[in-house]
Amino acid sequence: MILDFNKIEEKALANFKGGEKALNAKMNVDENNKILGGRLEPGASIGEHTHETNSEIIFFTSGKGKVIYDGKEERVEAGLCHYCPQGHNHTLINDSDDDLTFYAVIPEHPAR
């Protein structure tokens, strides 16, 4: 199955997960997975949250920023991949002067 993010409408999700400004996202969602192309403008963030029933893989395609993962800061930039396993928490912050763009996959996990 091909997902053409060039044809998916971008939606601004204000204060996503309690973050600052908006997450601009192109999303494909089904019963088991969320796949999105995301863009955070300078100063925007995704608020801190815990992945209770899923995990998240984020591959950064442009820009720079930081992830706070289980309380520890990690610098991110194009070409890096961040993984947040089920049961862990993170936040994503664009603290640069350019857009931070990425693709994220959030697969649901069966009940333990």
Residue ranges and their predicted role:
Residues 38, 58, 82:
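Conserved GNAT-family N-acetyltransferase fold
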Residues 72-86:
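Short acidic-glycine-tyrosine-enriched beta hairpin
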Residues 1-34, 47:
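A short, N-terminal "cap"/entry segment at the start of jelly-roll beta-barrel domains
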